[in-house]
């Protein structure tokens, strides 16, 4: 079993790495992920990656491992930055055609290898994009907007504000019509 640390290769042959049961471990700067960058506050930081290539008991070339990162996102509730921790598990089976995907064990997600060598950062970036929340938000207890969202409305202050300005409610006529029926 070969083991490469720190510097991950740009291109890989996933089938060869699986046959040799290789382990790739290292970091990748966030700035290298072009599709991920637009959803991030900034592209500083690194992604930690551990990938274990193998051929399973059924002869399926596969990779398992983890991707860890701290991604700076914009909370859609308060529009402030928050750090979103990602620890994404990977369990992919390398396939050459969509037909092969039908016979895979359920524990694997199929990954169609259309070109060989494969760009490793594309695989990592795909997994990171899948790990992102649909609507990024702080936890309610940490979000500054929560005090406005959960604030109970004081109905008496609204009525007194209308009376102070001397404005008549335009829907009060409808209330009178309802009473006549």
Language-model segments: which ranges?
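Conformational-control "hinges and anchors"
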Residues: 78
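Short cysteine-rich clusters marking metal-coordination/redox-active sites
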Residues: 75
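Cys/His-rich microdomains that often coordinate metals
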Residues: 82
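Hydrophobic alpha-helical segments of small multi-pass membrane proteins
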Residues: 69, 89-92
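Charge-rich, low-complexity linker and terminal segments
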Residues: 1-21, 87, 94-181
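A positional/architectural concept
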Residues: 1-72
């Amino acid at each position: 079993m070969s083991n490469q640390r720190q510097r991950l290769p740009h291109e890989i042959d996933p089938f060869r790495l699986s046959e040799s049961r290789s382990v790739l471990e290292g970091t990748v700067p966030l700035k290298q992920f072009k599709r991920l960058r637009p959803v991030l506050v900034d592209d500083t930081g690194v992604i930690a990656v551990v990938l274990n290539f193998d051929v399973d008991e059924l002869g399926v070339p596969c990779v398992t491992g983890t991707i860890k990162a701290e991604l700076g996102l914009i909370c859609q509730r308060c529009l402030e930055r928050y750090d979103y921790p990602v620890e994404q598990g990977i369990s992919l089976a390398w396939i050459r055609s969509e037909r092969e995907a039908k016979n895979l064990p359920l524990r694997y997600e199929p990954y169609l290898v259309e070109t060989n060598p494969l760009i490793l950062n594309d695989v990592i970036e795909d997994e990171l994009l899948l790990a992102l929340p649909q609507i990024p938000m702080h936890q309610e207890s940490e979000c500054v907007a929560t005090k406005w969202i959960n604030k109970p409305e004081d109905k008496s202050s609204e009525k007194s504000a209308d009376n102070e300005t001397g404005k008549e409610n335009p829907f009060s006529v409808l209330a009178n019509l309802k009473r006549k029926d």
